[in-house]
Regions:
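Short, small-residue-biased leader/transition segments that mark boundaries at the very start
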Residues: 2-7
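Conserved mixed alpha/beta catalytic, RNA-binding, or beta-rich assembly cores of soluble enzyme
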Residues: 56-123
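Structural signal for hydrophobic packing residues in well-ordered secondary-structure cores
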Residues: 17-24, 107, 111, 185-188
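Flexible, glycine/charged-enriched surface loops at secondary-structure junctions
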Residues: 8, 26-32, 107-122, 195
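Short terminal or interdomain "cap/linker" segment that borders an active site or interface and mediates
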Residues: 114-192, 202
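Active-site bordering "gate/hinge" segments
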Residues: 8-17
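A glycine-rich, hydrophobic loop/mini-helix early in the fold
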Residues: 19-84
Length: 202
């Protein structure tokens, strides 16, 4: 029975993936800036983001979106089929992370040619880097014009399947602060963890 469920789940994911991939139009925009300038602009509040940028004189702001077509396809998939809607939403989140990974890989290639080193990605909502900075990040990157990415009054991104992040830039090897539940100030009262999930999986 468990094997049958796995086969059925795999078939559902494959069925949902085809139209989702067809609807995706990934776009990425990034900006290299001095960290003091970002701090002065109010983009780097909190301690955790500064720990992540320790030893970095510059940082890269990055935004990646799959475009509105993916959001629309997720809605269509869920009409009359809750399982397909949930599967499509999960696939969309995974696809957005893959697009962010691809953009990061390009940035690492650029850094290598410049003799620079990058930290990993650190996104608004990690640790005490409040998602309230999303409008400032979007404005600095001009995401509305360059990528069609907007931020709502409640600091949510539209299209939903989008990622914003920051990477530290240094002249010497750096790791940055590891992201994840173990480093999150909300880990002891996180509603996602109570349900056996993480915010990254939503």
């Amino acid at each position: 029975r468990q094997r049958q469920m796995c086969i059925r789940d795999r078939a559902l994911l494959q069925k949902c993936a085809v139209p989702l991939l067809a609807a995706a139009m990934p776009r990425a925009v990034w900006l290299l800036a001095d960290t003091p300038a970002l701090t002065e602009a109010g983009i780097l509040p909190g301690e955790d983001v500064h720990k992540h940028l320790a030893g970095c004189g510059q940082a890269i702001l990055l935004a990646v979106t799959l475009g509105p077509g993916v959001d629309a396809q997720i809605r269509r998939a869920g009409v009359g089929d809750i399982a397909a809607g949930v599967a499509s939403d999960a696939l969309g989140s995974a696809l957005a992370e893959q697009a962010a990974d691809a953009a990061e890989a390009q940035l690492r290639q650029w850094a290598a040619t410049e003799g620079k080193y990058l930290t990993g990605r650190f996104s608004p909502g990690y640790g005490d880097w409040d998602i309230a900075v999303q409008p400032l990040v979007a404005a600095a990157l001009d995401t509305v014009r360059k990528a069609g990415l907007c931020v709502t009054d409640t600091n949510l991104m539209t299209p939903r399947k989008s990622v914003t992040a920051l990477l530290g830039v240094s002249d010497h090897p750096v790791k940055g602060q590891l992201a994840g539940c173990g480093h999150c100030v909300l880990r002891t009262r996180c509603e996602y963890r109570k349900r056996g999930k993480t915010c990254a999986s939503e």
